[in-house]
Amino acid sequence: MQEIIAKKTGVRVKETWLTGQTDAEAVGTIIAGGEYPDFINGGDSMKPLYDAGALVAWDDYIDKYPNIKEMYSDAEWESFRQDDGHIYWANVFQNKYGEDKTTTHNDEAFWIQVRVLEWAGYPEIETLDDYFDVIERYMEANPTMDDGTANIPYTILCEDWRYFCIENAGQFLDGYPNDGSVIVDTDNMKIVDYNTTETTKRYFEKLNEEYAKGMIDPEFATQTYDEYIAKLSTGAVLGMCDQWWDFAYNVNDVYKQQGLDLKGCNYVPLGLTIDKGMDQMWHTYGDTLNASNGIAITTSCKDVDAAFRFMNSCLDQEIHDLRFWGVEGIDYEVDENGLYYRTEEQRVNAADTGYQASHLCTYSYFPQWLGTSKDGKNAMQPAEQPSEFQNGMAEPLVKCFK
C-alpha cells in the first residue's frame, strides 16, 4: 500500500515510533542533536520543539493547500496559534467530514468485559460500588478462564504519562467530562483540582478497599505499558479505567485472532458516578479541540512545500480510501448502491497484525478524516461504517448491545 500511495503522491514516508523512551526524553535527545526528522509529532512535548526553533510555521502554507485548510474553521485554526503569532502544528485525530458516524467511545471510561455482564444478567451499573460488586461476584464464581488462566479482576496503568488511568477517574465520578487535569465548573465558572475533591478521596478509599480484598492486580503500580497490554491481550483482565485508544488498537485484533472475542473478552465502557442519580458527561470526546499537540514540519525538512503537498494529498479521497480501506477488490468490495463492505476473509486480513504490517499503510499520524466520505455514502474509516461495525462484532458483544 505504501508503494501505491508513493506512486500517486511522489512521497514515501519512513515512520519511526518511540521505543523505551517517553516523548519528553525522545524530544530532548532530538533537540540536543540538532537534527530533526522532516515530520514530527512530539505529543505533550511540542512546546520544547517550538521553543528550540525546530518547527516550520504553517501560516504561509495553509491557504495554499485546500485540504489542509478544510480541516478546521478559521476560529479553530486560531486555537493552534502560539505566542509568537504563528501556527506550527495541527491535531490530526479529531477532524470529522460531513455526518458524524462515530461508533466507538474513543475517550476514557471504566471498562468491563462483556462476559462479566452476560454472566450477571446485564445489570444496571451506575456507581463505582456497583462496578466492583459485579466484578467481585464474577470472580468468586469464575476465578479462572476456560483454559485455567487466572482472571485478574481489575488492573491499573500508572507508568509515566499514562498515570491518567489512575488519576483522572475522580472527575468522571463527579459527573464531569475530561477537561484535562482539572474540573471546569461552568455553573460558577471556577476551576477545581479534582485530586482534592471528596469524590476523589472516596475513589482512592474504594481502591484501597478492593486492593485489600485481592480485587486489584498487585503488580499495578510497577507494571510497564507493555506488561499492561500483555495482560489485557490474554483476555484475563475483567476491568480497568483507560482511554480506548490507549489499549484497543493493541488488544482487539489479538482477541479476534485468538478467538477471545467469541468468549466475551471485549470491553464496553461505563459512565460511572460516585453516587446514584448523578448527571454524567463522560462521553464528550468529539466536542473538545485539543490544540496542544499534533503533526509538525521541522526546519530540517529540505522541501517544505513537498511536505505540505503530501499532507494535503493524504486528505484526497482516493488516497484516504487507500490508507484506511485499502484496494478495492482486495481489501474491500463495493455493492450495487456504492456502499463499501468487507467479506469475512477481508475482515480477518484487516485484523491480522502480519497482514497489516506487510500490506496496509494508514500513515496514522498524518492528517485524516472521520465522518462521511465525500461520496456522501460511506464512512471515511471502516470502523465507522455501520455494516462493518456490526459485522465485526462477536456474538457476545452483539448480545450486550441488545
Residue positions per predicted region:
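Extracytoplasmic/secretory soluble proteins
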Residues: 1-402
